[in-house]
Amino acid sequence: MNNVEKAIEALKKGEIILVYDSDEREGETDMVVASQFITPEHIRIMRKDAGGLICTALHPDICNKLGIPFMVDILEFASQKFKVLRELYPNDIPYDEKSSFSITINHRKTFTGITDNDRAFTIKKLAELVKEGRFNDFGKEFRSPGHVTLLRAAEGLVKNRQGHTEMTVALAELANLVPITTICEMMGDDGNAMSKNETKRYAEKHNLIYLSGEEIINYYLDKYLKD
């Protein structure tokens, strides 16, 4: 069993894995868990040990069925009325051409939406809604803005973009899980992202699968080309 296959099995068990994108991109490691298995404990670990922004990444097919746009598209549309939004357009991202950010949500049964319990509840209920195919109930169950940031994966996943969003959703797809993942960047104590060596040591200490973006991309594309 290779490293990607080990990661797939870990995701199926509801375990956290670590994914490093590449030296040429963000140079960051994300904690990753399959959203259908999310628990408040996962959120707590991400919040305390990773410290970045906890986001939930969705397959583009799911986004299309839910009607969820990219945030840049919302800004562009709204800029017709609010000129400042045109000035804020993110056309100078140093590591990519376009951000994967979409909307933020809370489940309507949450209180503030920010607690570990509330965020886990929102994410799990989103995965349940998608798994059950209840796309028309999205607006009934969730409100926006909220405390769970949604990321919209690019069409074709890693064939067209090699961000943590696409790589982790591709892993969930390979695992035959609901293709939604919850991810969080690992931050260091020096004001920067945690180094690759530090995140590798963290993985070893906590017995977590650690893999690179290159491993995921090659495995996914190889399977895609064969199929």
Swiss-Prot record:
Pathway recorded for this protein: Cofactor biosynthesis; riboflavin biosynthesis; 2-hydroxy-3-oxobutyl phosphate from D-ribulose 5-phosphate: step 1/1
Positions bound to Mg(2+) 2: 26, 164
Keywords attached to this entry: Lyase, Magnesium, Manganese, Metal-binding, Riboflavin biosynthesis
Keyword field contains Manganese: yes
Essential for catalytic activity (site feature) positions: 147, 185
Effect ascribed to mutating residue 26 to D/Q/S: Loss of activity
GO cellular component, one term: cytosol
Listed result of changing residue 21 to S: Reduces activity 70-fold
Pfam assignment, any one: DHBP_synthase
Positions of D-ribulose 5-phosphate binding: 25-26, 30, 161-165
Function statement: Catalyzes the conversion of D-ribulose 5-phosphate to formate and 3,4-dihydroxy-2-butanone 4-phosphate.
Protein name: 3,4-dihydroxy-2-butanone 4-phosphate synthase
Species name: Methanocaldococcus jannaschii (strain ATCC 43067 / DSM 2661 / JAL-1 / JCM 10045 / NBRC 100440)
Lineage of the species this protein comes from: Archaea, Methanobacteriati, Methanobacteriota, Methanomada group, Methanococci
Encoding gene (name): ribB
